[in-house]
């Protein structure tokens, strides 16, 4: 559910996290999920099939995008798209100058115009079965365009637990990798993107 607080903006749930007021109702869980799936799919995976034009950096005109969504969902309003983006705690999307894009998770080929990460170390969670292969061959993207790295050990554990019960966390020597010419782009406060990470920069974090 998405609602809007007059003082603190859009939020998800029954009450504003800051002032605890209920705010104005906008979207129920069902509509929120439908919009979220379509926005994610279009901006990350199938813009052409959805009928929108995406530039090389992943941007889509927000008015054109809303027109496409209205054809699919008659109840769609432009405000709902802003509400979906601004209430998203994971920072999956950004809106700028009447354009919208996904910040990470792409399978379509886009260029990254983010700033370089300044974290000396980054982290990647893997299953015990994957670790030896990664240490030998490095980390490559599988279903996505870029490798997704975490800026903290804790976040890497959180992400890895989605896929495995006993994650092994790899530490990446980001400073050395960047010195050697590997680009590490900061997508959000928690996520850094890379084309690949060669094995010489990987180390297992001992518990």
UniProtKB/Swiss-Prot annotation:
Annotated EC: 2.7.1.-
Entry superkingdom: Archaea
Enzyme category, top tier: transferase
Pfam families the record matches: PTS_2-RNA
GO biological process: tRNA splicing, via endonucleolytic cleavage and ligation
MF terms (GO), sorted A to Z: NAD+ poly-ADP-ribosyltransferase activity; tRNA 2'-phosphotransferase activity
InterPro entries on file: Ptrans_KptA/Tpt1 (IPR002745), RNA_2'-PTrans_C (IPR042081), RNA_2'-PTrans_KptA (IPR022928), RNA_2'-PTrans_N (IPR042080)
Gene3D superfamilies registered for this protein in UniProt: 3.20.170.30, RNA 2'-phosphotransferase, Tpt1/KptA family, N-terminal domain
Keywords in alphabetical order: NAD, Transferase
Annotated family: Belongs to the KptA/TPT1 family.
Function of the molecule: Removes the 2'-phosphate from RNA via an intermediate in which the phosphate is ADP-ribosylated by NAD followed by a presumed transesterification to release the RNA and generate ADP-ribose 1''-2''-cyclic phosphate (APPR>P). May function as an ADP-ribosylase.
Protein name stated in the entry: Probable RNA 2'-phosphotransferase
Organism, as annotated: Methanosarcina barkeri (strain Fusaro / DSM 804)
